[in-house]
Amino acid sequence: MFDVLMYLFETYIHNEVEMRVDQDKLTDDLTQAGFHQDDIYNALNWLEKLADLQDGTGRAFALNADPLAMRIYTDEESQFLDTDCRGFLLFLEQIQVLNLETREMVIDRVMALDAAEFDLEDLKWVILMVLFNIPGCENAYQQMEDLVFEEDEQHLH
């Protein structure tokens, strides 16, 4: 499923294709690209739930927390998000790329993945996907995009 999400995100973002595509056509295109039906449906469901979170119709997060409070991860979250991932989320909060609400959206979407393995690079892409469509998060998205692609360029040199 994560491969389908990555494919969709890279294809639509970098080519600036209109995001409102007929789901049947999109499913056909993804099938022709070699993805399995189950992965396609899971990815589309994942994106639908992300859209619900972004427009406020999804699960509401308790955001009345003290700004100095620390996020305590559940055992399941800690197993899926290693210390590098959790540290990176904290770093992004500290530099105000993520706020309490967007952090919780990221964690929710990470935990909804069916990935057997998940690392910091995967987390960065999930963060980009979450920030991409949230009104008012354009600067945060740009900062995150700079962090992701700046690091990729450094690996090329």
Swiss-Prot record:
InterPro entries: Smg. It holds the Pfam family DUF494. Belongs to the Smg family. This is Protein Smg.
